[in-house]
Amino acid sequence: MSDQAEPGFVRVRLDLSYDGKDFSGWAKQTSRRTVQGEIEDALRTVTRSSVTYDLTVAGRTDAGVHARGQVAHVDLPEAVWAEHEEKLLRRLAGRLPLDVRIWRAAPAPAGFNARFSALWRRYAYRVGDRPGGVDPLTRGHVLWHDRPLDLDAMNEAAALMVGEHDFAAYCKKREGATTIRTLQKLRWVRDPATGVLTATVQADAFCHNMVRALIGAALFVGDGRRPAAWPAEVLAAKVRDPGVHVVRPHGLTLEEVAYPADALLAARAAEARNVRTLPGAGCC
Amino acid sequence: MSDQAEPGFVRVRLDLSYDGKDFSGWAKQTSRRTVQGEIEDALRTVTRSSVTYDLTVAGRTDAGVHARGQVAHVDLPEAVWAEHEEKLLRRLAGRLPLDVRIWRAAPAPAGFNARFSALWRRYAYRVGDRPGGVDPLTRGHVLWHDRPLDLDAMNEAAALMVGEHDFAAYCKKREGATTIRTLQKLRWVRDPATGVLTATVQADAFCHNMVRALIGAALFVGDGRRPAAWPAEVLAAKVRDPGVHVVRPHGLTLEEVAYPADALLAARAAEARNVRTLPGAGCC
């Protein structure tokens, strides 16, 4: 997983979205429908290649998790890229299923690695608390919570979580991997028209289940079952707390991945590899 | 279909939403899954009744058409209403499938008829024209148009259609039914964040296929295949024009039904029955 394409290859950045409902997550798995698998198959077909060009992704999402601003890169032979560059998007649009869309395919700047060059990832988690349920048209990406939620209490709790911490209490354990993360943003807003609450969760990187555990803790504060200080107390204990409920995946959407200026991409990738052993496994 | 509940009955107004994707439309049909059928079954079950209480609806939507602001009424025996009033919403929420939600169930004012008392219906039709397709998370209620659309041209054409006209050119013919309608609003906006174009279409009532034919004509103007004056020329001809493409149903959502002040409900119902023979069949 280098930060330069091999000689004779072009590193292509892909910006894409998917509805995670009918996928077993991003990462390729035998006999499972995955986002990575669908895109690699489509690329192979539209470029009439016999080989599969592996994708590297910014955020490996779990089964049921969506993405609107996912980023990946793929290294294509120069000849393949030259032949297909112009029509690649339109052909992929025709070949890919409607629950995956690729918006942009363009040569990446030197030093670009979709995963290691990323500065941060921004997720949204959406929740409806209307007694009747969730708008049928958005039920695929909005969780229903059957108790009214107090926005201020949730934001009070959220403010105590931001910053660099050991998020062990909110992460699925993985041998040898650090759970130190910098949570840059955790903030709730309520849409005045629909009443839907959206959490914005942004960090340099996330460990597995981290976002959905943070949301689970927040909902217990929002519906009054726990005080606003509780999530931070759990955080301080640094051990997985069975009282923290990991919410369902369908409310979670990867909205954006940010990268530094081109000149800083390679340095960022090196930094991300060294400072912390980023998790090899899933992310949310 | 009177404007008063029979003695011993309470007329209950229901405000509801549904995702039309997996329904054969609103109106009950044997061996077909319909919105009316699902709700009447749920009502029968939660009230433990042996009889079915028939629903009267404001806008009978076709297969695949959604609703966010649909209104219906049902006449329930006073004893049934008294027993179930308090828990009806929560029980219906538990019994109904997630693609139908009832937000409110409350006694209707005297003279209320969900269909005939309505002043107007407001629909939205949503279209995406990004080359890559439509956001996978909203593809269920947004149509993809594979050519870029000119908002100004579409609004120029739309302005020529507003007012009271014979919309025969845009309606599925139905013997004995008038196609005179008052199109109160036809206006396009583009969401700056998503790029999705939304048409707001509001009229006292619609004849069958009218909205989707109006949208089909507008899209031909938007992508440059037809001039802005064309839809109005078709309108003036008063005969169904094969050049008018009826767009697919999934972009269409009934957003709101408006009613007059309580004191005017009965008069409005009488007016709606007399002035025009409102269509017995489908609406959009």
From Swiss-Prot, chains A, B:
**Entry function:** Formation of pseudouridine at positions 38, 39 and 40 in the anticodon stem and loop of transfer RNAs.
List GO BP terms, alphabetically: tRNA pseudouridine synthesis
Per its record, the protein catalyses: uridine(38/39/40) in tRNA = pseudouridine(38/39/40) in tRNA
Q: Keywords for this entry? A: Isomerase, tRNA processing
The residues responsible for catalysis, as annotated, are D62 (nucleophile)
Main enzyme class:
isomerase
Q: What is its EC number?
A: 5.4.99.12
Q: Which SUPFAM superfamilies match?
A: Pseudouridine synthase (SSF55120)
Q: Which GO terms describe its molecular function?
A: RNA binding; tRNA pseudouridine(38-40) synthase activity
Q: What is the similarity comment for this entry?
A: Belongs to the tRNA pseudouridine synthase TruA family.
- Pfam families, alphabetized: PseudoU_synth_1
The SS bond pairs are none
Q: How does it assemble?
A: Homodimer.
Protein's name according to its UniProt entry: tRNA pseudouridine synthase A
Annotated substrate binding sites: Y123
Q: Which organism is it from?
A: Streptomyces griseus subsp. griseus (strain JCM 4626 / CBS 651.72 / NBRC 13350 / KCC S-0626 / ISP 5235)
